[in-house]
């Protein structure tokens, strides 16, 4: 157990910091102090995460580290349990990094800035808390904690149909949370003299195969909404299409990863027998999702909806990697989650920049803005190349691991592997079609005279917006050139889980 409560400080710091925002002064009705204060808290939080993990985490140790355990409700063994291992060591800093940049992207927000920035900090706390939770009921509470600020961010800032999108989001996610809670309590309290909610103790328990299957499915419903997995994905395009682009960065960069993390942390690690049964279906659904979402993306007029379907397609690789149950495949899935956290957040920032100048999200109302916005065009092109897995980018490193991951799986027949590989390849071929066509519609050709004439005189990205893009681009290229930067953190844990359970 850790001698100093590093993780507790990291998880709880944003909440009191957010509660102080209403007390901050706002000279002349401005929000400058609020913006800088929130950015400072996010940066401090990110530096705390970086310091803690750099100086107190052993990458060769597959067990839980920096463990903190404080009694809460002892009768059901509900404790404040935190810790990190190879599964969470990458996603937690990613949360801090993307949230800090999203706060910077939210600079133009002027409507109810106190509530907006307080909600961002509350969401920050919930997501970091989920990735560090070592108690299954605490995991559920953190899962629920981020729903409220996300709903506020969606319902109050965004497009004309933002209330519809926010309501759809809360119905889907709250509906998925019900089986998550039932499964968590059943797993912790069923059939043993001493109830336990501790992940470490739950990993050593065994359940009747029928119960394990029911538990697996109950958890899977919640993760299928968050990841998202077809057919529970329809909330995501609506949400991205209406949300403020800084909120979209948080959704694409972090929130989707909560589903993949839960699938590994609980379903794969705690319910290995059921996972072996459902793994082929994960692979099949993942392969279908890659092609389906890529096909639908090309028909989207709204730039943010097109990027949203791109995210759904890329999450298919995560499903295939998890379903492969191989070292290289699972490492590829984890790398894909981190890679997409960077690559998925950046296009929304750039789409927001384009919207701020053109006042339209529709691709057929843009056209030709590349001449007046060359910096935005360059960055958009760079991240489009990363999204279609150009060699030298993190997307290429992740997807090139998922392919051999499924091929090397011993539990699948040769025809199955060939079919899945062909479907994956089709999805990869479709990716440049919808991405490059989006670039063509936005930046090439002639100005659309039907739309706002100010498009031809649109101002290019400023220093703040370029800084956000560069901060996301550098690790994208760095991980692509040296993927061991991430793989060295999670490989020991992956090997341990696979050797003990599969």
Swiss-Prot record:
<keyword id="KW-0793">Thylakoid</keyword>
<protein>
    <recommendedName>
        <fullName>NAD(P)H-quinone oxidoreductase chain 4, chloroplastic</fullName>
        <ecNumber>7.1.1.-</ecNumber>
    </recommendedName>
</protein>
<feature type="transmembrane region" description="Helical">
    <location>
        <begin position="169"/>
        <end position="189"/>
    </location>
</feature>
<feature type="transmembrane region" description="Helical">
    <location>
        <begin position="115"/>
        <end position="132"/>
    </location>
</feature>
<dbReference type="InterPro" id="IPR010227">
    <property type="entry name" value="NADH_Q_OxRdtase_chainM/4"/>
</dbReference>
<feature type="transmembrane region" description="Helical">
    <location>
        <begin position="39"/>
        <end position="59"/>
    </location>
</feature>
<feature type="transmembrane region" description="Helical">
    <location>
        <begin position="315"/>
        <end position="335"/>
    </location>
</feature>
<feature type="transmembrane region" description="Helical">
    <location>
        <begin position="418"/>
        <end position="438"/>
    </location>
</feature>
<keyword id="KW-0521">NADP</keyword>
<dbReference type="InterPro" id="IPR022997">
    <property type="entry name" value="NADH_Q_OxRdtase_chain4"/>
</dbReference>
<comment type="similarity">
    <text>Belongs to the complex I subunit 4 family.</text>
</comment>
<feature type="transmembrane region" description="Helical">
    <location>
        <begin position="387"/>
        <end position="407"/>
    </location>
</feature>
<feature type="transmembrane region" description="Helical">
    <location>
        <begin position="136"/>
        <end position="156"/>
    </location>
</feature>
<feature type="transmembrane region" description="Helical">
    <location>
        <begin position="209"/>
        <end position="229"/>
    </location>
</feature>
<keyword id="KW-1133">Transmembrane helix</keyword>
<dbReference type="InterPro" id="IPR003918">
    <property type="entry name" value="NADH_UbQ_OxRdtase"/>
</dbReference>
<keyword id="KW-0812">Transmembrane</keyword>
<feature type="transmembrane region" description="Helical">
    <location>
        <begin position="4"/>
        <end position="24"/>
    </location>
</feature>
<feature type="transmembrane region" description="Helical">
    <location>
        <begin position="466"/>
        <end position="486"/>
    </location>
</feature>
<dbReference type="GO" id="GO:0008137">
    <property type="term" value="F:NADH dehydrogenase (ubiquinone) activity"/>
</dbReference>
<dbReference type="GO" id="GO:0042773">
    <property type="term" value="P:ATP synthesis coupled electron transport"/>
</dbReference>
<keyword id="KW-0472">Membrane</keyword>
<keyword id="KW-0150">Chloroplast</keyword>
<dbReference type="GO" id="GO:0009535">
    <property type="term" value="C:chloroplast thylakoid membrane"/>
</dbReference>
<feature type="transmembrane region" description="Helical">
    <location>
        <begin position="89"/>
        <end position="109"/>
    </location>
</feature>
<dbReference type="GO" id="GO:0015990">
    <property type="term" value="P:electron transport coupled proton transport"/>
</dbReference>
<feature type="transmembrane region" description="Helical">
    <location>
        <begin position="244"/>
        <end position="264"/>
    </location>
</feature>
<keyword id="KW-1278">Translocase</keyword>
<keyword id="KW-0934">Plastid</keyword>
<keyword id="KW-0618">Plastoquinone</keyword>
<keyword id="KW-0520">NAD</keyword>
<dbReference type="Pfam" id="PF00361">
    <property type="entry name" value="Proton_antipo_M"/>
</dbReference>
<feature type="transmembrane region" description="Helical">
    <location>
        <begin position="276"/>
        <end position="296"/>
    </location>
</feature>
<dbReference type="GO" id="GO:0048039">
    <property type="term" value="F:ubiquinone binding"/>
</dbReference>
<keyword id="KW-0874">Quinone</keyword>
<dbReference type="InterPro" id="IPR001750">
    <property type="entry name" value="ND/Mrp_TM"/>
</dbReference>
């Amino acid at each position: 157990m850790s001698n100093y409560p590093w993780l507790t400080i990291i998880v709880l710091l944003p909440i009191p910091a957010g509660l102080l925002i209403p007390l901050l002064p706002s000279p002349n009705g401005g929000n400058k102090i609020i913006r800088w204060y929130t950015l400072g808290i996010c940066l401090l939080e990110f530096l705390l995460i970086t310091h803690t993990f750099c100086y107190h985490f052993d990458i060769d140790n597959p067990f839980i580290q920096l463990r903190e355990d404080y009694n809460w409700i002892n009768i059901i063994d509900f404790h404040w349990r935190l810790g990190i291992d190879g599964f969470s060591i990458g996603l937690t800093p990613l949360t801090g990094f993307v949230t800090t940049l999203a706060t910077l992207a939210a600079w133009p927000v002027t409507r109810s800035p106190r509530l907006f920035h307080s909600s961002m900090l509350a969401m920050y706390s919930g997501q970091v808390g989920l990735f560090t939770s070592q108690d299954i009921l605490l995991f559920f509470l953190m899962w629920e904690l981020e729903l409220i600020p996300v709903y506020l961010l969606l319902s109050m800032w965004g497009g004309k149909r933002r209330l519809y999108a926010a309501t759809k989001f809360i119905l889907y996610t709250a509906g998925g949370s019900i089986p998550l809670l039932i499964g968590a309590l059943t797993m912790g309290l069923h059939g043993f003299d001493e109830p336990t909610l501790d992940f470490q103790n739950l990993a050593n328990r065994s359940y009747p195969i029928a119960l394990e299957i029911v538990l697996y499915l109950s958890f899977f419903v919640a993760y299928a909404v968050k990841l998202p997995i077809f057919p529970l994905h329809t909330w995501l395009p609506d949400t991205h299409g209406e949300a403020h682009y800084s909120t979209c960065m948080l959704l694409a960069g972090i929130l989707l990863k909560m589903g993949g993390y839960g699938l590994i942390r609980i379903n794969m690690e705690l319910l290995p027998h059921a996972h072996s049964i459902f793994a082929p279906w994960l692979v099949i659904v993942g392969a279908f999702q890659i092609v389906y979402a890529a096909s639908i993306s090309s028909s989207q007029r709204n730039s943010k909806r097109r990027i949203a379907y791109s995210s759904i397609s890329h999450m298919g690789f995560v499903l295939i990697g998890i379903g492969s149950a191989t070292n290289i495949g699972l490492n590829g899935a984890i790398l894909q989650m981190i890679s997409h956290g960077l690559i998925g957040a950046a296009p929304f920032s750039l789409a927001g920049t384009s919207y701020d100048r053109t006042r339209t999200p529709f691709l057929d109302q843009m056209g030709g803005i590349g001449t007046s916005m060359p910096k935005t065009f360059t960055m958009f092109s760079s991240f489009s190349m990363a999204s279609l897995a150009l060699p030298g980018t993190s997307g290429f490193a992740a997807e090139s691991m998922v392919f051999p991951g499924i091929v090397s799986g011993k539990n699948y027949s040769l025809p199955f592997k060939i079919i899945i590989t062909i479907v994956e390849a089709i999805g990869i071929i479709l990716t440049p079609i919808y991405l490059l066509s989006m670039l063509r519609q936005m930046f090439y050709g002639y100005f659309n005279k039907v739309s706002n004439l100010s498009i031809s005189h649109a101002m290019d990205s400023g220093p703040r917006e370029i800084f956000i893009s560069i901060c996301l681009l550098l690790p994208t290229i760095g991980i692509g050139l040296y993927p061991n930067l991430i793989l060295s953190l999670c490989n020991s844990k992956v090997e341990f889980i696979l050797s003990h359970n599969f």
